[in-house]
Amino acid sequence: MRRRLFSMMLVLSLFCLSARAEIDLSTQSPQPTSTPAPVELSGTALLDAPPMALDCAAALLLEPESGQIIFEMNADSPRAVASVTKVMTILLTLEAIDDGRVALDDVVTISESAAGMGGSQVLLDVGETQTVDVLLKSMIVGSANDAAVALAEVLYGSEELCVDRMNERAQQLGMAGTHFVNCTGLPADGQHTTARDVARMSAAMFSHPLYYEYAHIWLDEVDHGDGRVTQLTNTNRLIRLYDGCDGGKTGSTDEAGYCIAATAQRGDMRLIAIVLGAPSGAERFDIAGEMFDYGFANYRLYPVAERGTRVRGGLPVEGGSQGSVAVQLDADLTLLILKGSEQGIQLSPNLPESLAAPVAAGDRVGSVDVVVDGKTVASIPVAAAEDVDATGLPYALRRILSRWPAIGG
């Protein structure tokens, strides 16, 4: 009976939470301290199939704060994605700037290899000098292949070494279906990725504030210093066509079709739309816009729990210096839910009747399951909020023996 009453009190107290926060359910290999943790995508999409007809080869709609996929189509099918490949090149550049390995005002001398790139370019000449700032802008706004290679060379010494790092970073982000061969997305045997993997690296790129200082630019120009000026026009038409769109990377080749990884924000919710293999440039923008419309119209972020929130009543402690210990939520949680479905969220505690002393602050003592429509969608760990020492002769003897100097030599 005592446990039942305690469980009811816990559920009532947890429903009083209102602070908005984000849970980190991801793991990654060691990274520089400024590198954001990868977004951990949910294993199952909220919808079994897209809610509208999508005239493209693959698609995915993601809410990156929760990591929740709203819907997907052929998300794990390997494909060429053309210049959407540059998402990884941009990401590595942003991370290098954050880590202090390069600065925006660093001057780069353009190599023959960079100047000789085909496809979309900003028309750099061999021996020309440009700043990292100009090259990054040219890649984000104009999808310039020559700028991408120039940055790859300044970051890693050569495009080949940059590609090695691209593949390494892809593995760290959990991009199991991806292999890079170049840093531009120009056609190359063996180069492929998936809509799910594009979502992973795009979420990482979109997490950098510096990215948005370039992504919103519609028209600009590059001064080459010899009298030539190259006009830049943003390849992502959605920044002009869709309310809330503030970033994205396009790409197209005969093999890849027309692709885009775009993001839009309305209120406190950001969405990422991945469209691969659309039949035309206009249709990829239309499809992404439809996907955004559905997500913003039907879903919202709901703050469920905040790390450090005390669970009322605490837990009894047997053999302790005090009779109970305060316990608290040990993670934050925000869920993506259908608008109006808040009442369907239930919190179910999984806590022991009591704890045995000693108890240290931070010790995990149980969890609280988050249940939506009868399904457990997340589990929030619960930890001790304070230390409780043990009392009694057996414990005292163990402490004395543990501190006794070793005998012998």
Indicate residue ranges for each PLM-predicted region:
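Positively charged n-region of N-terminal signal peptides that target proteins for export
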Residues: 1-4
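General helical structural elements
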Residues: 6-8, 253
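Bacterial N-terminal signal peptides
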Residues: 8-16
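Surface-exposed charge patches
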Residues: 12, 168, 262
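Hydrophobic alpha-helical membrane context
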Residues: 15-16, 98, 291
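Bacterial Sec-dependent signal peptides at the C-terminal "C-region" and cleavage site
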Residues: 17-23, 383
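Active-site-adjacent loops and short helices of periplasmic peptidoglycan-processing enzymes
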Residues: 22-196, 200-209
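Domain-terminus/edge residues, biased toward the C-terminal soluble/receptor-binding domains
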Residues: 175-179, 187-409
